[in-house]
């Protein structure tokens, strides 16, 4: 099937190379190659695995990690190595693949961050439990206090390691509150990545998370002034 595409050659301005897409592939392996200038990865979907290469892209710039779901645009090519012919996808675009819920959660967080009105129900969905704050802190501390992730990937990993319900929305609120306490810095990078760096370790006692202006604002929206 891939070889049949050669019938469309020669490519050019009047006959561009055909580009295809796949949605919701799961990244199973990824590494930088070519002196760290290009990204080589392997992904699977529906029980099938395929190799991919993306020139002038790196793992860090992609914003993805092993286990993440992605959408890819590509043109296929055949590698012939020592008599073995395999299909490899030459990527031209790569981005995280989000579920409808993840898209909705990120939209709600951005809405709140812009200071726009949200409903009491939405506010209640955004307020983290104390164990969620602790889980976020433990994850960051266990990774040397220096993490670069897309929010969805970060939320998934934190939930998995701590046996919690995954919520990109509340993970983002936790990060914002912790940053407001001066415990970390957060820089936004390419592909929606967050570069998070802890500034200092907690030293005994419990942080008053619910005294944070961010949480108090959410509580007021959720339950009123006496909430």
Model regions and ranges:
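Acidic, two-metal ion nucleic-acid-processing modules in DNA metabolism proteins
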Residues: 1-227
């Amino acid at each position: 099937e891939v070889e049949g595409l050669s019938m469309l050659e020669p490519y050019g301005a009047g006959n561009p190379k055909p580009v295809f897409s796949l949605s919701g592939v799961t990244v199973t392996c990824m590494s930088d190659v070519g002196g760290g200038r290009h990204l080589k990865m392997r992904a699977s979907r529906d029980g099938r695995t395929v190799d991919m290469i993306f020139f002038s892209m790196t793992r860090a710039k992609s914003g993805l990690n092993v286990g993440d779901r992605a959408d890819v645009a590509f043109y296929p090519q055949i590698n012939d190595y020592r008599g073995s012919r395999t299909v490899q996808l030459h990527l031209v675009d790569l981005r995280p693949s989000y579920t409808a819920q993840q898209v909705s959660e990120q939209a709600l967080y951005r809405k709140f961050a812009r200071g726009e009105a949200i409903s009491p129900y939405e506010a209640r969905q955004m307020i983290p439990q104390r164990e969620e704050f602790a889980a976020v802190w433990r994850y960051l501390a266990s990774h040397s206090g220096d993490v670069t992730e897309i929010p969805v990937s970060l939320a998934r990993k934190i939930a998995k390691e701590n046996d919690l319900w995954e919520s990109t929305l509340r993970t983002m609120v936790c990060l914002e509150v912790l940053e407001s306490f001066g415990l970390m810095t957060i820089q936004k990078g390419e592909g929606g990545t967050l570069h998070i760096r802890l500034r200092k370790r907690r030293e005994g006692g419990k942080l008053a998370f619910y005294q944070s202006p961010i949480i108090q604002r959410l509580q007021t929206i959720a339950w009123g002034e006496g909430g």
